[in-house]
């Protein structure tokens, strides 16, 4: 393959994730994006039980029952001249670690905001994570077919709460039952909305020019006058779009629309392929790797069990950073130092897998894994280096796991260790007893673990409260002092799934006191994989 062909393949890749608060419409927007990418023919809307058309990207049993996306799916589709990789992140209240780690594998994010509610808690948290890497953000103000807050007010809220400048690209005309469409500030065109066309791609009527009398006829004189008035204000008070500020993560272009009505999604996609960066360079512990390099490198950011219920398999999701993946390629797994031949990597359309012959930087490929691959693993063509910045977060919630049948202790431990390698939950084994404590960043994770232990490992377990409120990974360069610390705090020490030592504190007060007492011991809130 010639260098120019390789460069062309790299330059057309766009890899992004969607971040939002639960119920802001993330799964619906994912569906509509796939519809525009011709990846699906009609969009199934996410509803509670009873509706048979399940959304394409929600595929684990529990997700189908609850109408929420629990695991991160990966979908690739063509749009315009680009190939887009969309990483779907769980939108539900408390899915987190998976989501945080997924954000380390993308070059850009789409923030979906419910325009009736504005900035919500979950969005704030996710934005903090994107800030760690200054990821560029596009914004979609959703649900304009309902009654929303004043758009100017919502933009102000985004700017003040998320500390990012907003540059409106389109502007809404009316909302709720009076929603008529949007005006594009940079193309000087109005796109008119028709109701009831949400499941397919609709032909949109376009009115050129803001002073066109046709506009008054189409949306009514009152709304047309209101639009012109609002635009005067918008042009005076808001930021203009600047590509450099967007790429630095300082400014977000804002699009208005309704994902359910399939309106405005294509404007956002046009912005994404035009402005979002092609695959970006990444740091390793020795140097920076750019997408232009011909030698293959990649890192694993997620492990998912049982995408295929018929086989008890696990799939490791790897982001390609540089080079071209080819079938039966020999790669070095840096952590173990072993060379492995990867003959059957997968590409995804949530849950439907197909084997791939090649992949380029920005693409996500799936590797079959029988427990040998861990989150954070780096694969290269022989170079010894490790990609950095794939964090493990200290859990905020803890439960003790107990068996209904005490004879199944071995299966329980195996199940929990596998689930912890996958990042579904973190496991802590106290040094002084045989308890198994699981830590999570959100309550729903405990239900998921119990459900999966039952379906995948045939283990009936229940969880109960435990006197732990937080955990920190501990280390100390002074061996003697560390031994003393371990001896005196044995009751509060545990090993995690990767056998790293952690201090599990009953209260924050206890943690702070212990910290003061042992200044030479470092207490880490995150741990690199």
Swiss-Prot record:
Domain of life per record: Bacteria
GO molecular function, one term: translation release factor activity, codon nonspecific
Signal peptide start-end: none
InterPro entries from the UniProt entry: EF-G-like_DII, EFG_III/V, G_TR_CS, P-loop_NTPase, PrfC, RF3_C, RF3_dom_3_sf, RF3_GTP-bd
Binding locations of GTP: 20-27, 88-92, 142-145
GO cellular component: cytosol
Compartments where located: Cytoplasm
Assigned keywords, A-Z: Cytoplasm, GTP-binding, Nucleotide-binding, Protein biosynthesis
GO biological process terms, semicolon-separated: regulation of translational termination
tr-type G domain mapped to chain residues: 11-280
CDD domains (UniProt xref): RF3, RF3_II, RF3_III
Pfam families: EF-G_D2, GTP_EFTU, RF3_C
Its biological purpose: Increases the formation of ribosomal termination complexes and stimulates activities of RF-1 and RF-2. It binds guanine nucleotides and has strong preference for UGA stop codons. It may interact directly with the ribosome. The stimulation of RF-1 and RF-2 is significantly reduced by GTP and GDP, but not by GMP.
Family (UniProt): Belongs to the TRAFAC class translation factor GTPase superfamily. Classic translation factor GTPase family. PrfC subfamily.
NCBIfam families: prfC, PRK00741.1, small_GTP
Protein name: Peptide chain release factor 3
Native source species: Pectobacterium carotovorum subsp. carotovorum (strain PC1)
Gene responsible for this protein: prfC
């Amino acid at each position: 393959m010639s260098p120019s062909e390789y460069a062309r393949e790299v330059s057309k890749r766009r890899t992004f994730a969607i971040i939002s608060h639960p119920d802001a419409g993330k799964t619906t927007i994912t569906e509509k994006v796939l519809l525009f990418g011709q990846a699906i023919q009609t969009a199934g809307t996410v509803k509670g039980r009873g509706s048979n058309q399940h959304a394409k990207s929600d595929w684990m049993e529990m997700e189908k029952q609850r109408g929420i996306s629990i695991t991160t799916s990966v979908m690739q589709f063509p749009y315009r001249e680009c190939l887009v990789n969309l990483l779907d992140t769980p939108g539900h209240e408390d899915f987190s670690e998976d989501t945080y780690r997924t954000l380390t594998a993308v070059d850009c994010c789409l923030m979906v905001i419910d325009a009736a509610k504005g900035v919500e808690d979950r969005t704030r948290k996710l934005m903090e994570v994107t800030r760690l890497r200054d990821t560029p953000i596009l914004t979609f103000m959703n649900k304009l077919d309902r009654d929303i807050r004043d758009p100017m007010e919502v933009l102000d809220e985004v700017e003040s709460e998320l500390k990012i400048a907003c540059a409106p690209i389109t502007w809404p005309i009316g909302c709720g039952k009076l929603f008529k469409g949007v005006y594009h500030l940079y193309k000087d065109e109005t796109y008119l909305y028709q109701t009831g066309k949400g499941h397919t791609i609709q032909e949109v009527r376009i009115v050129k020019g803001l002073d066109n009398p046709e506009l008054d006829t189409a949306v009514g004189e009152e709304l047309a006058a209101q639009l012109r008035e609002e635009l005067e204000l918008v042009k005076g008070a808001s930021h203009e779009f600047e590509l450099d500020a967007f790429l630095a993560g300082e400014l977000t272009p804002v699009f208005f629309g309704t994902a359910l009505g399939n309106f405005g999604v294509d404007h956002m996609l046009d912005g994404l392929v035009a402005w979002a960066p092609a695959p970006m360079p990444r740091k390793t512990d020795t140097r920076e790797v750019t997408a232009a390099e011909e030698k293959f490198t990649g890192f694993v950011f997620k492990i998912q069990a049982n995408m295929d219920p018929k086989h008890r398999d696990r799939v490791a999701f790897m982001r390609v950073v540089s080079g071209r993946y080819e079938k039966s390629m020999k790669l070095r797994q840096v952590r173990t130092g072993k060379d492995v031949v990867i003959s059957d990597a997968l590409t995804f359309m949530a849950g439907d897998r197909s084997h791939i012959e090649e992949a380029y930087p920005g693409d996500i490929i799936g590797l079959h894994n029988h427990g040998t691959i861990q989150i954070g693993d780096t694969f290269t063509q022989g170079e010894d280096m490790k990609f950095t910045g794939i964090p493990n977060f200290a859990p905020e919630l803890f439960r003790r796991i107990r068996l209904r049948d005490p004879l199944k202790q071995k299966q329980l431990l195996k199940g929990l260790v596998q689930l912890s390698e996958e990042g579904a939950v973190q496991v802590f084994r106290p040094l002084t007893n045989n308890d198994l404590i699981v830590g999570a960043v959100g309550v729903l994770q405990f239900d998921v673990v119990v459900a999966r232990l039952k379906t995948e490992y045939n283990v009936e377990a229940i969880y109960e409260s435990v006197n732990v409120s937080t955990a920190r990974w501990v280390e100390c360069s002074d061996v003697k002092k560390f031994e003393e610390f371990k001896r005196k705090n044995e009751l509060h020490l545990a090993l995690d799934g990767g056998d790293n030592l952690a201090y599990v504190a009953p209260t924050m007060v206890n943690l702070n006191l212990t910290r003061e007492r042992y200044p030479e011991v470092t207490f880490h809130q995150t741990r690199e994989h």
